Amino acid sequence: MLRFILTRVSLIIPTFLGITLLAFFLIRLVPGDPIETLAGERGIDPARHEQLRKEYGFDQPILVQYGIYLSRVLQGDLGKSMITQEAVLSEFSALFPATIELATCAILFALLLGLPAGIIAAIKRNSIFDHGVMGISLAGYSMPIFWWGLILILLFSVQFDLTPVSGRIDVLYYIEPITGFLLIDTLLSDEPEAFWSAVRHLILPTIVLGTVPLAVIARMTRSAMLEVLGEDYIRTAKAKGLSRFRIVALHALRNALIPVVTVIGLQIGVLFTGAILTETIFSWPGVGKWLIDAIFRRDYPVLQGGALLLGVVVMSVNLLVDLAYGLINPRIRHTR
């Protein structure tokens, strides 16, 4: 087991370097001069323009710029926003809890609906319920996030006025940030109504962001459960006269969930990717909307730092899921 853990952990270094390369070089392909973006419509004189280029290192060769960037990253310095002059790490830290809160609610939504749907669909194979789950999951997986978000806004916010359109909480409430997670902060505040306001603001973004993971988890759970139900030990349990509930709960479910754990880990990356669009649609003040704003403003340090930090988060979560998969499935840790 120790060898398995060391092997997985050793992959962090090349993966991290790959993330820094992507974050640095791909962003450099964005058209436009960032210094002119800083200047705005008024523009600046050539001397000031050259001074800013030297200050931000844009006068150096591209490889030298990357070397400077990598050395600063290793020291924990991700630079400052060219627009706000705030440290990128500070801005990320302030906004990341909002993204984590949304992503957590989305994955819980996907698990609470996807796992039971997949299990029941496998037990009732070729039934109307099974076909319904497969059809809905296919539609959910294929549906564009921005289209799905706008449809839900038009239906539940505009037509029926059941949910808010944007934001994390009504403007009537001011909640002192303690943890950064609004659901927790509202519970710690003296305004219990603020908690329900935060819940109402979470409903639509959670559904939109959790739809794709829900579809994937439901289909994968069904597939894994069908495979397990066809094993010899399941037929032996049936021959012994065990009830369907005992067979599924005590014998089939644990083994069927092993591949689902890996799928859940892979959905973390999907959640952060989908959060970029979801937060933009619902004006959710998280990392995704922050990065979209940085793209329009050509704020290179924010784009580089934000992409790098998100990559590190996804890498870390996938590492933990990989280790957890090795713990629950001994065959994996002995074959790798």
Where are these regions (language model features)?
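Hydrophobic alpha-helical segments of integral membrane proteins
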Residues: 9, 48, 52, 62-78, ...
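Hydrophobic alpha-helical membrane-insertion segments
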Residues: 16-21, 140-161, 267
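Residue-level signal for discrete positions within transmembrane alpha-helices
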Residues: 12, 95, 99, 107, ...
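Alpha-helical transmembrane segments of integral membrane proteins
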Residues: 2-4, 96-129, 145, 158, ...
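N-terminal signal-anchor/signal peptide hydrophobic helix marking the start
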Residues: 6-12, 16
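Hydrophobic alpha-helical transmembrane segments of membrane transport/permease proteins
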Residues: 15-67, 156-194
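An internal, D/E-rich "acidic patch" concept
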Residues: 59-115
